[in-house]
């Protein structure tokens, strides 16, 4: 039986709306320049996008000459349909692969004889949409696929108090307190503005969602009634180091971007 989050992301109207209206505009996208720079300085590689969704990253992966193939993994067939349509415009070969990041059994067989270095990328806080235990499981699964020449690049949202960028709130909204509180409200508004979610939620639950920043867990949480249907975690550097340690991965580089940490991991 699918989880509440899977129900939302498998909704037929989500894929195209998310790719067109949201994923190109959300604040964390600006920090993907570090991922592009890192990949562009490598030799010939294949890029494996974990949770590729509608394939937004194909817009820049297609421009990197050393990327010889892109394999996008996602569990949502509707999102992969959007990705496949976008891939037709690409020069680079793109393979859309349906698999679950909790298992990756099909994908393991698929890349068994691969000779080129693989760079796994997990963008726009995809890992932060899982629980603590699930994050560890996903990273251990990916580690089990990696050879010494392979790398895993994560983009993880920073805690609000670490974000120095100005957050522009609507004029009618006033908030008392420090910049951290302002950033937290800005974060909630960012998620509140994801109107693409409202239609799927309304059709499934007949209720509008509520958005909440939990200061104890550092999660942005979306509720429908009392049900938690989506979380988006905010990370600290210390937390990232512990997560890598749990998954038995080594941090090659940890870059602090404007809104995100870009973490490069190896075995």
Regions found by a protein language model. Give the residues of each.
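Conserved SAM/SAH-binding beta-strand->alpha-helix loop
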Residues: 76-78
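Conserved SAM-binding strand-loop segment of SAM-dependent methyltransferases
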Residues: 90-106
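Class I SAM-dependent methyltransferase Rossmann-like catalytic core
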Residues: 2-34
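A short, conserved alpha-helix within the catalytic core of class I
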Residues: 129-141
């Amino acid at each position: 039986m699918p989880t509440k989050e899977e129900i939302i992301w498998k909704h037929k109207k989500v894929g195209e709306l998310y790719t067109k209206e949201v994923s190109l505009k959300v604040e964390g996208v600006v920090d993907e320049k570090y991922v592009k720079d890192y990949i562009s300085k490598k030799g010939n590689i294949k890029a494996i996008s974990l949770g590729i969704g509608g394939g937004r990253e194909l817009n820049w992966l297609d421009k990197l000459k050393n990327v010889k193939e892109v394999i996008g993994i996602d569990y949502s067939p509707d999102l992969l349909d959007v990705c496949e349509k976008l891939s037709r415009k690409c020069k680079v070969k793109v393979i859309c692969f349906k698999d679950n990041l909790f298992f990756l059994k099909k994908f393991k067989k698929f890349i068994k004889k691969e000779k080129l270095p693989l760079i796994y990328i997990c963008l726009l806080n995809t890992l932060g949409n899982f629980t603590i235990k699930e994050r560890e499981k996903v990273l251990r699964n990916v580690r089990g696929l990696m050879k010494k020449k392979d790398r895993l690049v994560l983009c993880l949202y920073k805690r609000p108090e670490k974000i120095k960028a100005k957050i522009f709130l609507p004029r009618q909204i006033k908030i008392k307190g420090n910049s951290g509180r302002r950033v937290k409200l800005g974060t909630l508004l960012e998620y509140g503005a994801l109107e693409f979610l409202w239609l799927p939620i309304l059709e499934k639950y007949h209720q509008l969602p509520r958005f909440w920043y939990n200061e104890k867990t550092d999660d942005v949480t979306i509720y429908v009634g009392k049900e938690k249907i989506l979380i988006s975690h905010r990370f600290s550097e210390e937390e990232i180091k512990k997560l890598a340690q749990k998954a038995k991965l080594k941090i090659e580089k940890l870059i602090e971007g404007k809104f995100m940490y870009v973490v490069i991991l190896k075995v």
